[in-house]
Structures are given as structure tokens and as C-alpha cells.
Amino acid sequence: MLIRFKGAHIVDPGNINEQKDLLVKDGLVHALLDPGAADPEPGIDTVDVTGMLLVPGLIDLHVHLREPGHEYKETIQTGLMAAAKGGFTAVCPMPNTSPVNDNAQVTRFILDRAKAAGLSRVYPVGAITLGLKGETLAEYGEMKQAGMVAITDDGRPVENARVMRRAMEYATGLGLPVMSHSEDLSLARDGAMNEGSFATRIGIKGIPNAAESIMVMREIAIAELTHARVHIAHVSCEESVDAIRHGKQRGVQVTCETAPHYFTLTDKAVGDYDTHAKMNPPLRSEADRLAVIKGLQDGTIDCIATDHAPHSPLEKAVEFDQAAFGIIGLETSLVLSLKLVQDELLSMETLVEKMSRNPARFLGLDNRLIPGNPADITVIDPDRVHVIDPETFVSKSRNTPFAGIEVKGEVLLTMVEGRIIYQREI
């Protein structure tokens, strides 16, 4: 099958940033053609994407698909539907399922479900420790053979530094990166939002920046000691950005991600105890928000992920202290991130680096739009203005703090290996 994407501005960092036509054949990028060039062979289906942006498929390094065990929140099928609608051609599900993804059997189950869904690619992340208990290391070798790509105890920190050292040593021997949920529970325990004047005024126990940054510094130090690759998840505060910047300057193999809510909102979004603005780490101060943007600008922050964390209404419609941490993000991440481009804080090329190229590098993938590579593509309508409406989500859950916000830009089409897995109704 031959498909010609006609009229788009292609943004592929380090490769192309201009108007070209893209030809897809048998699931692969076949050729880049000048606008107006004749079809190189007969039987080509043309998709007119004039005025649109065409980029390598977006990749989300941090999602919670909830299956197995919590299918009332999300399933692999519905999570991948949300990913496709959000422009993501690949996602990395975290291991905090039930049972935990701490063995090859669960890894294979996730991959089998993903294959049956036939949507975005799935690269499972396995647990650092059995049962996420922070004690006994999981069997990384067997999980890697089954298809696991990295390890983390996300949702919980590995509190014991010796266990984390052993994990990094073991992972390094297998060529696996270690993703860190950086949280000092002795500082964060019982907290529900950012520690600051606003939390004091509304009477909510706070979580200080130090609860995150202390553990970020520890992980960087252990990675330096063990020569491991460490990836800091969901960076939210200025001190963490500074620590990662200094670690990179020392040559430590540290990468990191943030999420759109950390450069879009502050702790003021909690407002009148809005549990949809409760996540971990929490929304921080304006100074932290600006520090995260600076980290994206100067390359300290490598990736934008979602930390897509679905919850049922019953888990959010309770007192703020008792509500579950987490928000969904697969269907809103791109449109919120495009605001950075619209406000001239990032170039479109840099945004694609954060949401596609750098996540691909983390996974050891080459997702450039060059002949012979898989045709994993996201087409974006940069001008469509709309209001975020959770009732239109295809995710099972609706827990977002962005309901009612007007945004500019929307995914028009998502393609994986030459198959259109999502196309916006016009």
C-alpha cells in the first residue's frame, strides 16, 4: 500500500524542517518528495495535509495503563486508544499493576494485550524490586528477554540506597536504564500538595521541594558511582532541575522528564480543594514552573511525558487529603505543550525533540523520517482552537485539571508502521 502525505510542513529534528511530501510504502517511510513532484509510481493514495505539521510519532515514556488488576480505571485497550488520539505512537507503561510487572509472565501479558489492541506500540517498564517493596531485586534478565526496556518502582521510591546501588549495577550489566521516582517519604509522608503559603492558608499538609530534590541528588550520586544510566521521572521543582543540570555537567549519564502540568499550572490550581489538581509530585510554585521551562529550553530536561494516571470518580470525589494522587494526560499533553511554541518559549523543532526524538533515543530507537524507517507519524493541525472537554475523552477516566481550558492545536492523524490508528473526524 502506498500513501502520499501531501502539503505538510515536516518537522523532524536534525533531519528536515520544511514543506515536503512524505511517501509511505509497506509500513515504511519510502521517500520525501518536493511539493508538486509527480508520483514516482502508480496506485498512490493521497492524503491532503496542507497547512498541517507532520512529525515523527510522539513517544510517552511514562504512563499507567492499569492493566492487569485495575481495569476499572483503564485498560490497555482504552489507554492505547487515548494514546493514539493524543498523537502517541509508543508508550511505556509503569509496573505498578496488580500483579506488579516484576516478572517475565506479566511483561508478556502486557505485550500480548497490546498486540491484540493493534494500536500504539508498547514498551513495558519492569519493577526494580519484587512487589515494589524496595527490598529484593526483580529478575531483570528474564524480563528483558520478554520485552522489558527499563526498570522503576514508580509510584514509590527505592528508599534504601544500597538496594538502589545494587539495582543500578545489575541494570548496567544488562544495558538497562533505571527510572527513578524521586521522593523522600520521611519528608513527603502525609502531604497532599506543595508545601507553601497557599497550603498553609487552606489547611493542607504540604510536600516540600526537598522531598524530591534530595532523592534526585542521591540517584545522580549513585549513577556516578556505578556508571549507570539513570532517568529522573516527573521533575517538578527548581532544585531538581539544578541538580540534574550539574550532574550532566559532570558527565553523569542522567536524563529526565517533566510533564505538562508542571510547566502549565502551579499549586494555586488546587483552588477550592480541587482533587483533579492533586498529583505526586505536586504542582509547585511559579518559580518552580519557570525553572522547569528553563530546563526544557537549555536541554537539562530531555523529555516531556504525561505520567498518565487514570482514577475512577469515586477515588477523586472525596476529601482532598483522602483523594488519589494523579491525573490523566495522554489526550491533552500535546495541545498543552504546543502552548510553549505559541508563546515562543520553545521552537517546534525543540518540542518534537522533547516528545519524540529524545524519548526514542532513550529507548534506543531511530524514529527519523528517513527511507527505510518505520512509518510512525503524527499529523498535527496547529490552528484548530477548541476547549478541552473530558466527556470527549476515549480514556476510561476523566480526572484532569484542564477541563474547560481553551487550547490551540489538535492531532489530526496518528500512524504506526503505515497503519492509521487514529484520524480526527472532520
UniProtKB/Swiss-Prot annotation:
Residues that bind substrate: H64, L65, R66, N96, N280, H311, F325, G326
Binding residue positions for Zn(2+) 2: D154, H181, H234
This protein's encoding gene: pyrC
PANTHER family noted in UniProt: ALLANTOINASE
GO biological process: 'de novo' UMP biosynthetic process; purine nucleobase catabolic process
Catalytic residues of the enzyme: D307
Manner of cofactor binding, per the entry note: Binds 2 Zn(2+) ions per subunit.
Pathway: Pyrimidine metabolism; UMP biosynthesis via de novo pathway; (S)-dihydroorotate from bicarbonate: step 3/3
HAMAP family assigned to the protein according to its UniProt record, in alphabetical order: PyrC_classI_B
Swiss-Prot/TrEMBL cofactor(s): Zn(2+)
Protein name: Dihydroorotase
The species this protein was found in: Desulforapulum autotrophicum (strain ATCC 43914 / DSM 3382 / VKM B-1955 / HRM2)
NCBIfam families tied to this protein: pyrC_multi (TIGR00857)
Catalytic activity: (S)-dihydroorotate + H2O = N-carbamoyl-L-aspartate + H(+)
Source organism, top-level taxon: Bacteria
PROSITE patterns named in the record: DIHYDROOROTASE_1, DIHYDROOROTASE_2
